[in-house]
Amino acid sequence: MDPEMRAGTLLLAALLSAILLALAACSRNDDTAVPPPRSSITFLHYFTDSLSGGIDEMSQGFNNQHPALELKAISLDHEAFKTSIQDTLKTDNPPELYSYWAGARTASIVDELEPLDELWQQAGWDKAFAPSVIKAASEYRGKKYFLPLTQHYIAFFYNKKLFDQLQLQPPKTWEEFLAVCAALKARGITPIALGARDKWPAQFWFDYLLLRTAPYSFRQQLMSGEARFDDPQVRAVFARWKSLIDKGYFNSRPHPNELAWDSGANDMVFRGEAAMTLMGTWNLAYFSNNTHQWQAGKDFDFFPFPQIDPAIPTVALGPIDGIVMPKRAHDKAGAGTALRYLASAEAQRTFSRYSGALAPNLQVPDSAYSDIQRRVRKELERSPVFDFAFDLATPPPVAELGLDAFAEFLAFPDAYPEITRRLADEAAARFSATRAVKPAP
């Protein structure tokens, strides 16, 4: 080969190599190209600390299925959340979604929410949720605003090994309950742990003592301001509650107002210092977490609040958590996509698994639940009525008065006649003020 031909061949080879390298580089650039940014859907919620089970897993499930969207779940503790939602709802750039409590809490902010009726119909959610749940939790002023996410049940959670050791059976009547408490006290064990540092846990005692002794219609009247908190039926509740305190059936050191519901009261039950606590089914996740590793049905179990008056039909108590969309949300389409996923059986099954809650979605089968969750579901089915706890059943300004009154009562049980009189007067004024603010059409 002459020198010129050889030089040409080498040049051609060099050019081909350069082209191949360039193509390879382009290929590598294509492979490593930064994907377009995902649109963020902000979801502000209150599922924190001991109540956080399932929220991250559920959010991740959405993000895995929607590469163009990112559900950003941002948590605040309960009290901070109550303030934050009021402050941010009316701004020009609120989060796309909020968690919230069904009942009076949602009713109090409905003017700031986006109706979900069109999305509801498109998604066929009337088939996904029970009519009773839709009516109680989702509908306000004839429109749907609230997507149900969890349903919890308030019951006694007890140290089963301790009960078995002392040959005690879960009580079904008030007389049996008092006998169990007396037996525990005689053995030096605190019968009932109450951690009311955050105020709201004490309300369950007021609620159930009222619902087991007074007609359900009276409770509805009380929650709506048609009955007063110094009514004899209410005072009888405080008198019965006081008798339990006087007998030493609650923890006194630390005092309930100084004790957390989880690391305080629950852990007293876990350690065997107390036998039981009145709390929600989020305790299923708490007692079985990595720290405690209790097995439901073996180490701990639950029983319903005992019957007091056989003439009073059973009412089950608990919250329904869900999701609302503010009417000022910027990305309503993206928020709607997120709501479709969060309403699905897949998402609600995930949340139920980690939180201990029952899934409102009817398409979640019984096989998805643990044995204790299935038994909880049966208790709910046996109750003619399911209602929300005190602070979710009455307007927020009245609820705050009540929670303060319960805390004051725990500190000064003998003062309940004065506490109920003052609560009655202050609640009447709050109800009047609430009625004076006419809802927007």
What is each residue range found by the language model?
Residues 102-155, 169, 178, 205, ...:
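Hinge/lid segment of periplasmic solute-binding proteins
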Residues 118-131, 213-236, 290-295, 307-314:
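Short, solvent-exposed loop/beta-turn-alpha elements that line the ligand-binding surface or hinge
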Residues 145-149, 154, 178-230:
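Extracytoplasmic/periplasmic solute-binding protein
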Residues 183, 224-258, 305:
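Glycine-centered hinge/linker elements that transmit conformational signals in sensory
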Residues 87, 95-96, 123-162, 190-194, ...:
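A structural signal for short loop-to-beta-strand junctions that line the ligand-binding cleft
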Residues 60, 247-250, 289-357:
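Extracytoplasmic/periplasmic substrate-recognition and gating elements
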Residues 23-106, 110, 121-127, 170, ...:
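Conserved N-terminal structural module of periplasmic/extracytoplasmic solute-binding proteins
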Residues 27, 111, 164, 383-441:
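Conserved C-terminal helix/tail region of periplasmic/extracytoplasmic solute-binding proteins
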